[in-house]
Amino acid sequence: MTTTTHILGYPRIGEKRELKFAQEKYWRGEIDQAELKKVGAELRHKNWQTQASAGLSFAVAGDFAWYDHVLTTTLLLGHVPKRHRHGFPDLDTLFRVGRGQSQSSCACHGAAASDMTKWFNTNYHYIVPEFSKEDTFEVSWPQLFEEVNEAVQAGHNVKPVLLGPLSYLYLGKEIEDGFDRLTLLPRLLTAYQAILAKLAKQGVEWVQIDEPILALELEKPWLDAFKLAYQVIRSDVKVLLTTYFDSVVDSLDRIVELSVDGLHVDLSAAPEQLDAVLAKLPQNWVLSLGVVNGRNVWRSDVKAQLERLQPVKAALGERLWVASSCSLLHSPVDLELEAGLSAEVRSWFAFAKQKVSEVVLLGKALDGDAAAIAQCEAYSQPIQARKSAAHVHKATVQSRVNAITAELAQRSVPYAERARHQAEVLQLPLLPTTTIGSFPQTSEIRVQRSAYRSGQLSSAEYEQALKGHIADAVKRQEALDLDVLVHGEAERNDMVEYFAENLAGFQTTQFGWVQSYGSRCVKPAIVVADIEREQPITVGWSTYAQSLTSKQMKGMLTGPVTILCWTFPREDISRKAIAQQLALALRDEVSDLQDAGINIIQIDEPAIREGLPLKKRDHQNYLDWAVEAFRISAASARPETQIHTHMCYSEFNEIIESVAALDADVITIETSRSNMELLKAFEEFNYPNEIGPGVYDIHSPNIPSEEWIVDLVKKAAQKIPVERLWVNPDCGLKTRNWPETEAALANLVSAAKRLRKEFAKETTAVNSEAVADVETEA
């Protein structure tokens, strides 16, 4: 009885980010579409060959995306937003939806990108589908079928992957009032019928249909819709219904009624669901168990997994499939490239290519292969050795964590009193202007960093080069007349990796890249041991920048929850414990910054919402310790020290109480893509502190006009008192170039100055009316 082995998807970016570099060359006009497509084809074939050479039963097709797999599905379904429809959809259409289109690049007066948000509780972003009640769907984008043909012609046994109809609808949003997007399901199912019919004609036996929303706490109408949907799209192609990121026990009674041929569940995220799934699994279904974690870099304990799976194999026989927990999109590509790792550390890890081999090894061992069983034993030994390593578990760190009290997470005085102290010290105007922290990482900076790391630049030479970039950033900001400056973060390759490189307990990699969105990739550090700060990290750069200007300089820190969410965490201790260790380290940095004369310190927490568990019943426990971690890091600040925080792409309604509980003096948020909709949560909650709603989208190359910014700030002022508003971009400017940055910021500053005058006139007029009323009454 041969065990079927497969994965849910493979990284699409290439082991050295080949796709990223090709995309960006294409966008700059340096290569044509044919050259870009050639790079994509080469990556796909290499990925399929990796899977086939390892011995997987299937090669996955349809997991490749030019920007995002949800956006690919949008084009597959002929569902392009109207503002981006210019003839038959092509690759440029896809990029317009994802990136937007400036007025200067077309005759259509520009078109905004679609919203982008987090993919469940990961750091991957997807482009949000837009729905209106007149929408129709038609299969018009051939990418999936072309890639199936490519794989078949290359000799692979293909399993296409497709985002399911209910998840596609659920992950989108209505763009007009008065209708429920679920009413579009019958029309959408017609398109899915056509897709499956085409795949059947191509000879496909199995298709993987991803319905990750089944791991959520779905409302009854959504859950009930599944039965009809899968009856309607039933075809000659066998369907593996795929779920991941959490347990599906809540939805299991509905799932087992569906017209499908198998179910995949994520045992890495929710191992406790196995017994319930086995008890209710239909007799004719296969069961795919995701036991190799697709979201991390840790070597799988295949010995333990084998022992766990053997009884399931005995019960199900060939109906048991072994798989990755989710797509390996969330893992780096290949550990073999990491020449700089010690043998011990290397033995702890497995990247996507190695995880494929783990899946295959488990399949062979389950089939009784004696050599594979012995290999499982040997492969798991480093995991056991790590459990007792003294350099992993540090007594000094444990002692400090154990001493945490409620008082440690409390600022010395309430916000209202702090605000008075800060107003006296900072002397800022109405609608103060600032940026979120980073400035363009120019090619010169990247070349110098590379030269330093390769030994071509000495430490002293590199430090002088960085000081030059900092001085340049300060000079540009002063010329723009921004109110609160930043040093620009030239010394940081990444907002998390930089801290990981300067805190004990982390391991960084050279090629550990994963996709964040579009062409943007991140290289998460790995928490390998207890975390501690051995010396100041940012103080020298911030104080140097402050010495160059009489304006206020913001210190820039990445918060404990974001560092946790944007790194690969340990599996042997809780996320809460890691967050506490990080908070204590950052608390020391806050103390040193203010002692060095930095009066404003930003502790970025853009990832705080994405850390939420998928089940709402688990939210409060997470939010309690996440808020505590932030407060521990900030609470060493004196009353006159203003603490800022920044959050990205967050839907705040369900966490607004916890956002307020952070007790940051100023919060900056991304709001421009949502046209200030996100501020409703702050308005309804009567959020008491200061807010900087982002007034332009830094993820798009479009430069906002002064009028655009004025309009957004006025909308914000309808929801938040103007005296508590700041004016700033949505996010850091690292990925933009200097001409774009300066043009946008010039419009931002001029908009703020114009609005100060307008609001001052309104205040004067109101005061005059009040005086006149008093005189009349007299």
Swiss-Prot record:
Q: Which Pfam families match?
A: Meth_synt_1, Meth_synt_2
Q: Recite the UniProt keywords alphabetically.
A: Amino-acid biosynthesis, Metal-binding, Methionine biosynthesis, Methyltransferase, Repeat, Transferase, Zinc
Q: In which pathway does it act?
A: Amino-acid biosynthesis; L-methionine biosynthesis via de novo pathway; L-methionine from L-homocysteine (MetE route): step 1/1
- Per the entry, which co-factors are needed? Zn(2+)
Whether Magnesium counts among this entry's keywords is no
Q: Which residues form the active site?
A: H699
Q: What's the source species for this entry?
A: Vibrio vulnificus (strain CMCP6)
Q: Cofactor stoichiometry and binding?
A: Binds 1 zinc ion per subunit.
Q: Name one GO biological process term.
A: methylation
Name a GO molecular-function annotation: zinc ion binding
- Listed binding positions for Zn(2+) are H646, C648, E670, C731
- Name under which the protein is recorded: 5-methyltetrahydropteroyltriglutamate--homocysteine methyltransferase
* Record carries keyword Translocase: no
Q: List residues binding L-methionine.
A: I436, G437, S438, E489, D604
The record's family statement is: Belongs to the vitamin-B12 independent methionine synthase family.
As for what it does, the entry says: Catalyzes the transfer of a methyl group from 5-methyltetrahydrofolate to homocysteine resulting in methionine formation.
Q: Record-annotated residues binding L-homocysteine?
A: I436, G437, S438, E489, D604
EC numbers for this chain: 2.1.1.14
Q: Which residues bind 5-methyltetrahydropteroyltri-L-glutamate?
A: R17, E18, L19, K20, K118, R520, C521, W566, E610
Reactions accelerated catalytically: 5-methyltetrahydropteroyltri-L-glutamate + L-homocysteine = tetrahydropteroyltri-L-glutamate + L-methionine
